Regions:
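Transmembrane alpha-helices and adjacent helix-loop boundaries
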Residues: 1-292
């Protein structure tokens, strides 16, 4: 059943929409032209200002920042997903204390700005006797914050599965934790892959907050290059383009996976029969592991 949010536009409405689109485009182009004119008047479009960005040493310097960005994001992903899984299980647990603790963690760390967490990790923890380098301060902040986000993503994935998945697993003799580990979690992870990748893109962009603690990720390296060459605008444009390319690539992968997942579900690949087959495989693996 589809929901119609508004009537279809008639000929007059379509003409008005076309005129509005053309007018908005014209205004945007005018702003762009004005900005370029101002930049040109101040010499910001001179070739000499941009030529420094193609120098090998500058390129290597910026690529080093990109490596640092990817390294911090990749390392932070691991504890974030592990703790996120624990939080998801805690949120759906029959144990009241586990639900309360997991819920409190999620609510607290989703409410605190990530910038504040990174600042606390670098400047606050030393007051408690824990000294972290800029790199580990960024990783720690990203990890504790994104654990709460991934916890909600995984919980949504678990709750989106048919209850028959767990019931079928329990009916053939698996313990509840075995059913969750062998049957439910693998399917929940697969179902939420597009969302996981989308959050990974956000995590990658959030590494730029490391500039506040002098971590030399891509943005910080761009800032240094701009100050050294006295062309900060050009350096920031180069950094923005690198972020754009990386994030567009990850977003494209996420969209493709989302389309593939949607087609699988529409084709009925996830069904009760599929659940029974999954449980049978899981039980076989469990028995085989126990025999070994």
């Amino acid at each position: 059943m589809s929901v119609v949010l508004g009537d279809a536009l008639g000929p007059r409405g379509r003409r008005r929409a076309t005129v509005a689109s053309v007018a908005a485009t014209a205004v945007l182009l005018a702003f762009v032209a004005l900005a370029l004119q101002r930049l040109s008047a101040k010499g910001q479009l001179d070739a000499a200002k941009w030529s420094i960005l193609v120098k090998p040493q500058v390129i290597r310097f910026l690529l080093g920042g990109l490596v640092n960005t990817l390294r911090a994001a990749g390392v932070a992903m691991i504890p974030a997903m592990v703790v996120g899984t624990v939080l998801a299980l805690g949120r759906i647990s029959f144990n009241v204390l586990a639900r309360l603790l997991a819920g409190a963690y999620v609510q607290f760390f989703r409410s605190v700005p990530l910038f504040v967490l990174i600042i606390f990790m670098y400047y606050g923890l030393p007051k408690l006797g824990v000294d972290l380098s800029p790199y580990w301060a960024v990783v720690a902040g990203l990890s504790v914050y994104n654990a709460a986000i991934f916890g909600e993503i995984f919980r949504a994935g678990i709750l989106s599965l048919d209850r028959g998945q767990t019931e079928a697993a329990l009916s053939v003799g698996l313990q509840r934790w075995q059913a969750m580990r062998l049957v439910v979690l693998p399917q929940a992870y697969r179902r939420m892959i597009p969302t996981i990748l989308s959050q990974s893109v956000t995590l990658l962009k959030d590494t730029s907050l490391g500039v506040a603690v002098t971590y030399e990720e891509l943005l910080r390296r761009g800032q240094i290059a701009g100050e050294f060459g006295k062309n900060p605008l050009q350096a920031y444009v180069a950094v923005a383009l690198v972020y754009l390319v990386v994030n567009m690539a990850l977003s494209r992968v996420a969209r493709r996976l989302e389309v593939r997942q949607r087609r699988r579900y529409q084709a009925g690949s996830i069904s009760v029969a599929g659940a029974e087959e999954t449980v049978a495989v899981a039980v076989g693996a469990s028995i085989g592991g126990g025999g070994a």
